[in-house]
Regions:
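Alpha-helical subdomain
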Residues: 1-140
Length: 140
């Protein structure tokens, strides 16, 4: 119980602003760890970069207009996903996607009619859940 974490209990974890700076291997290991250490019904809220509009799924593509800006700021982009593959990506790691929207959609829904500046469509927030034993991670 050190630090408040109890393995095997229903947990909610917020993993915001982290995924894009990790390697694919680190993202994979973290998701698998989360699914193995927490009880069914546990949820993971996370953000990620949607690569669908950029023409490539690797972290080395030149098509990301802000990639160099991030690198110069000491925050190199390493990982993103195409939105269409997120459900299968999570299912392979023992999780089920329950919600996935762009930050622009999330903010517009939460603050209708307000000037929100220019939130992006490619920065997304998602909710994944450890399915109950009777369910499968693919959505049963």
């Amino acid at each position: 119980a050190r630090g408040g974490f109890l393995s095997g209990k229903v947990t909610v974890c917020v993993w915001e602003g982290v995924v894009s700076y990790l390697s694919e291997e680190a993202v994979d290991a973290t998701l698998r760890w989360f699914a193995s250490q927490n009880a069914p019904g546990s949820r993971l809220v996370f953000t990620y970069i949607d690569l669908s509009g950029f023409g490539s799924v690797s972290g080395a593509e030149e098509g990301l207009p802000w990639k160099n800006v991030l690198a110069k700021a000491g925050e190199p982009f390493r990982f993103g996903l195409e939105t269409a593959v997120v459900p299968a990506f999570l299912a392979e790691r023992g999780l089920r996607l329950t919600w996935d929207v762009s930050t622009a959609e999330a903010l517009a829904g939460r603050y209708p009619g307000r000037d929100l500046g220019s939130p992006t469509e490619f920065y997304r927030v998602a909710l994944a859940e450890i399915p109950a034993a009777a369910d499968d991670a693919a959505g049963g």
